[in-house]
């Protein structure tokens, strides 16, 4: 059984290039990568039908002589060329199918053969068969014809010398494998016409030389621009492979006659005048040089005469082209050259992903990076800098796709879009504004939110539910119309920054709370910068005006420096003086919010499309499972919809409003709690309704894989060969398991901990994170990985505490994020190797030396400064030179008693670990003291 065809083999059979066939296969949806890829038999059959239909559907044109130089055409597929030898005096218009009747169609073999010998008294150039060199002038000529070949160079060489042996035609006259057209009838036969070299000969018959034969060096190329009425000494020009009909069959061939001159094989002179009377290859009207003396080699397809460089095959051309594309040598490894090509890679991509983009070997990329000083594996997520470095070395422009672009491309692959309203303007309806309150911690932001809730919600319903959901709606009576306003109760502005960074347009207006008795604080300036970066209009609430020290005008002047100019000063920012504690001017603040929304924003959305929104908060409820707080931005969310929120997905089983009531649907700007997700989503993740659960699961899985790759690339430290020895040393690692009350808290805590920079000797590794209480599973994981569990606003449940005590797992509970960060930073510093510095404690001078057989030399010393201690390190200095750097005091005595130290002004005897001592030597005692790490 024959093996499968490869792409280049099939391309050769179909007569196309491998590049064209590869492009066609990829358009058909077949999985092929290179020209060496195998092709299944059904695909081979389909490609043969495809190219067969393509060839039959378009008119064929005569191939150029160079294109036919190396192959024998099949007469059943490639008939005689439209440039067959024209008669000197055409008799009439050619038969249908000839090039004269249909310039864009290829003549049949019989018609072309009949048109060649036809002759009449009156020549008709318009009806004559097309001549080479005129093909470019015909309007229906194909672009494949090359008229430059027909027009020869001026001053051609003379034809072959007289006496040349007759040459056999290129095609084997005894071959019966190809079908040949019948001999032309009617008119003067080619044998009756005078030939260029004399009488009709074997090479002068009206049969074409073999198209595949190659003319010898110097064989004539006739100048194919002879005029129709010009005198023709030979009765016509010698045919060329592009102009002559196919060789007739042996039964149709005329008998051979005497050989004539000028019987050059292959492409002899074209239909121009081959020479003067009786002169082989003499000058004719725009005639070309005649062919050289032909040989029998022409009958077998080999050139006669001096050798000529043959035409390169497709394989040779392809090899030369690939050789021109010299590979880049990066670190001693040959890699493909990009030539400035742009490559898009996702954040956290691996070298295997890079290699797949450029059709290279991932192992070669690993070796190249290793030689460049970077140590990574093929499947390891690498940083953006490493990808840029490798791309620059190979001349590729690496573009790391941002998370927003990557998510948009992911949704487009599922034919989904996020962030645009569907339909026309008449489909859009008004929606309530979404307002976020920002400001300094002590400026009354929380009190303002509580005041608004108490005025619009009953005191019995304003408890934990509203605080827990983090968002609520209030109604404002403006000009007799009740208008709802949605408030986000997200503590602090860190979550606001994260949402802006993700591009979520969840906030329409920001209320900036500034205390009238305190002024503009650093967090106030930070909040202003957040609002400006998000291009959100700001309404300033000057709070605490009921205090005696309040200075509202001073606040207005300070905020003017930051671009918030009050309306009374000629600006466009609304300022409202309020007292959140007294409930003063709260209605005016809400009206100012609505006026700003009407003047600055187009608050419209399509309520009839599939819902899209944003998750502002998510947590794990013990009885209800993962719960996400959603604000619908456009469309309507209904119970039963299949949704995907970040890397979490599920079906909406239940929706709860800010009052704890169940709702069946939520329109634009409506905050609700959604139950039914499979996992806890992240704060700021986008919500999208899809058609089915399978699509939601696929989107969530791909987002989760992307997030893990990006996290791995961000947390991985670049290891180079220079610091390999340091890396291989024992490194202290603090493993942590984070548990929090909601996803936003866990995310903020994780980001803050990963930003702690202590030293390269210690590392922080967060092995697990989650929402909810500390479970027994967390304890077992911490015990196996020697980790510390950090619980933020949560406690342990069940037997988790007992398991932690039994296995020695440390669980730390925190309710303030800054305290958790400080303690973990201190723990990391405590894991550092201590740094010691030298501290001098005293000096002594050797006054006398005693010898003892038991201990050796004893130095009698006087303590000059400080004190000396037993076992202390000493430095022995003689004449200003250090004799010993790290000697120790092995024995210390005062009189006859062993002592631990001797103070300044006292004599003592000591035995040193360094025996080479002399009188007058100076002893400097010191100790190594640990220095606290910053």
From Swiss-Prot:
Ranges for region G5: 579-581
Coiled coil region boundaries: none
Region (G4): 543-546
Feature: compositional bias, Basic residues: 308-317
Biased composition (Low complexity): 80-154, 185-197, 206-231, 238-250
Assigned GO CC terms: cytosol
Molecular function in Gene Ontology: GTP binding; GTPase activity; translation initiation factor activity
Pfam families for this protein: EF-G_D2, GTP_EFTU, IF-2, IF2_N
Region annotated G2, chain positions: 464-468
Record keywords: Cytoplasm, GTP-binding, Initiation factor, Nucleotide-binding, Protein biosynthesis
Binding site for GTP: 439-446, 489-493, 543-546
Protein name: Translation initiation factor IF-2
Gene behind this protein: infB
């Amino acid at each position: 059984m024959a093996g499968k065809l490869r792409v280049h083999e099939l391309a050769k059979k179909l007569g196309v290039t491998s590049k064209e066939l590869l492009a066609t296969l990829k358009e058909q949806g077949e999985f092929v990568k290179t020209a060496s890829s195998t092709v299944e038999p059904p695909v081979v059959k389909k490609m043969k039908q495809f190219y067969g239909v393509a060839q039959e559907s378009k008119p064929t044109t005569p191939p150029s002589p160079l294109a036919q130089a190396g192959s024998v055409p099949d007469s059943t597929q490639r008939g005689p060329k439209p440039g067959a030898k024209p008669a000197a005096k055409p008799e009439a218009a050619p038969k249908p199918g000839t090039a004269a009747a249909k310039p864009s169609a290829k003549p049949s073999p019989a018609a072309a053969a009949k048109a060649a010998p036809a002759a009449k008294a009156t020549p008709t150039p318009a009806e004559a068969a097309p001549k080479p060199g005129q093909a470019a002038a015909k309007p229906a000529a194909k672009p494949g014809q090359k008229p430059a070949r027909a027009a020869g160079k001026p001053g051609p060489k003379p034809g072959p010398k007289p006496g040349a042996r007759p040459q056999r035609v290129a095609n084997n006259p005894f071959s019966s494998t190809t079908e040949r057209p019948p001999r032309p009838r009617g008119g003067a036969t080619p044998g009756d016409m005078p030939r260029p070299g004399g009488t009709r000969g074997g090479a002068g018959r009206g049969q074409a030389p073999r198209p595949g034969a190659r003319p010898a060096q110097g064989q004539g190329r006739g100048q194919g621009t002879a005029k129709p009425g010009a005198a023709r000494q030979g009765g016509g020009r010698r045919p060329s492979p592009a102009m002559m009909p196919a060789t007739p069959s042996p039964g149709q061939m005329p008998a051979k006659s005497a050989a004539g001159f000028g019987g050059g094989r292959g492409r002899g002179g074209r239909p121009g005048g081959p020479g003067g009377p009786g002169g082989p290859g003499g000058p004719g009207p725009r005639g070309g040089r005649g062919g050289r003396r032909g040989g029998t080699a022409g009958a077998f397809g080999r050139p006669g005469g001096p050798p000529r460089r043959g035409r390169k095959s497709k394989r040779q051309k392809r090899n030369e082209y690939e050789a021109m594309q010299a590979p880049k040598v990066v670190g001693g490894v040959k890699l493909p050259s990009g030539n400035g090509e742009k490559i898009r890679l996702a954040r956290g991509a691996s070298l295997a992903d890079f290699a797949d983009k450029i059709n290279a070997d991932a192992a070669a990329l690993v070796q190249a990076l290793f030689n460049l000083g970077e140590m990574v594996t093929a499947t390891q997520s690498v940083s953006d800098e490493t990808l840029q470095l490798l791309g620059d070395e190979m001349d590729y422009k690496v573009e790391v796709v941002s998370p927003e672009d990557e998510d948009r491309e992911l949704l487009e692959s599922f034919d989904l879009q996020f962030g645009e309203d569907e339909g026309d303007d008449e489909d859009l309806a008004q929606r309530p504004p979404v307002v976020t309150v920002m400001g300094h911690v002590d400026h009354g932001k929380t009190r303002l939110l509580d005041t608004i809730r108490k005025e619009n919600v009953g005191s019995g319903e304003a408890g934990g539910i509203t605080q827990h959901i983090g968002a609520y709606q209030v109604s404002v009576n403006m000009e007799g119309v009740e208008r709802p306003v949605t408030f986000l109760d997200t503590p602090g502005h860190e979550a606001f920054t994260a949402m802006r960074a993700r591009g979520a347009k969840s906030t329409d207006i920001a209320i900036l709370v500034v205390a009238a008795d305190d002024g503009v604080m650093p967090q106030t300036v930070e909040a202003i910068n957040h609002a400006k970066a998000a291009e959100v209009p700001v309404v300033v609430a000057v709070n605490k005006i009921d205090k005696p020290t309040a200075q509202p005008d001073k606040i207005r002047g300070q905020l003017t420096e930051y671009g918030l100019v009050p309306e009374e000063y000629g600006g466009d920012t609304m300022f409202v003086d309020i007292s959140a504690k007294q409930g003063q001017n709260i209605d005016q603040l809400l009206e100012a919010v609505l006026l700003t929304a009407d003047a600055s924003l187009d608050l419209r959305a399509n309520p009839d499309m599939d819902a899209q929104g944003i998750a502002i908060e998510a947590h794990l409820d013990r009885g209800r499972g993962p719960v996400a707080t959603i604000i619908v931005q456009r469309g309507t969310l209904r119970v039963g919809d299949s949704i995907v929120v970040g890397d979490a997905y599920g079906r909406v089983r239940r929706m709860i409003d800010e009052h704890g009531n169940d709702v069946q649907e939520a329109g634009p700007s409506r905050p609700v709690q959604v139950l039914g997700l499979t996992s806890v989503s992240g704060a700021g993740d986008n919500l999208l309704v899809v058609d089915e659960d399978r699509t939601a699961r696929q989107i969530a899985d791909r987002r989760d894989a992307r997030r893990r790759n990006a996290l791995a690339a961000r947390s991985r430290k670049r290891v180079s060969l220079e610091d390999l020895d340091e890396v291989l040393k024992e490194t202290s690692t603090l493993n942590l398991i984070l548990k929090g009350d909601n996803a936003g808290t866990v995310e903020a805590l994780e980001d803050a901990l990963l930003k702690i920079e202590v030293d390269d000797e210690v590392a922080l590794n967060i092995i697990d994170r989650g929402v909810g209480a500390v479970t027994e599973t967390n304890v077992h994981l911490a015990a196996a990985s020697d980790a510390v569990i950090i619980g933020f606003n949560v406690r342990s449940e069940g037997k988790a505490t007992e398991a932690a005590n039994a296995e020695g797992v440390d669980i730390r509970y925190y309710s303030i994020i800054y305290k958790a960060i400080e303690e973990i930073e201190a723990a990391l510093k405590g894991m550092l190797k201590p740094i010691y510095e030298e501290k001098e404690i005293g000096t002594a001078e050797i006054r006398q030396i005693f010898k003892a057989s038991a201990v050796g030399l004893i130095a009698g010393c006087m303590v000059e400064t400080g004190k000396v201690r037993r076992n202390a390190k000493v430095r022995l200095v003689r004449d200003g030179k250090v004799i010993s750097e790290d000697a120790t005091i092995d024995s210390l005595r005062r009189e006859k008693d062993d002592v631990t130290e001797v103070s300044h002004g006292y004599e003592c005897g000591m035995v040193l670990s360094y025996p080479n001592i002399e009188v007058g030597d100076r002893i400097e005692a010191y100790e190594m003291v640990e220095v606290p790490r910053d």
